[in-house]
Curated annotation (Swiss-Prot):
A GO MF term: toxin activity
Protein name: Venom peptide 2-long
Family: Belongs to the MCD family. Protonectin subfamily.
Biological processes annotated in GO: defense response to bacterium; defense response to fungus; hemolysis in another organism; innate immune response
Modification sites for Leucine amide: L68
Phylogenetic placement of the source organism: Eukaryota, Metazoa, Ecdysozoa, Arthropoda, Hexapoda
Keyword Transcription: no
Tissues expressing this chain: Expressed by the venom gland.
Propeptide: 25-54
Leader sequence segment: 1-24
Amino acid sequence: MKQSIIIALFATIAVMACLQMVAAVPAPVPEAAPGPVAEAEAYASPEALASPEAEPILGIITSLLKSLGKK
């Protein structure tokens, strides 16, 4: 009986220590996501259109414009 009380006491102390450690860590502050206008402005800059990553997108746009112009 005395042994189980001591084990329960140590378990309670361990749980309290874990809860204290969890409560001491501050929660991360979520960053605000950029708005759609700011994101669109970033993609519409001349530097973004001149980058090599934009070549496939520009190819799709030019082919769509060519196909629409033929009709």
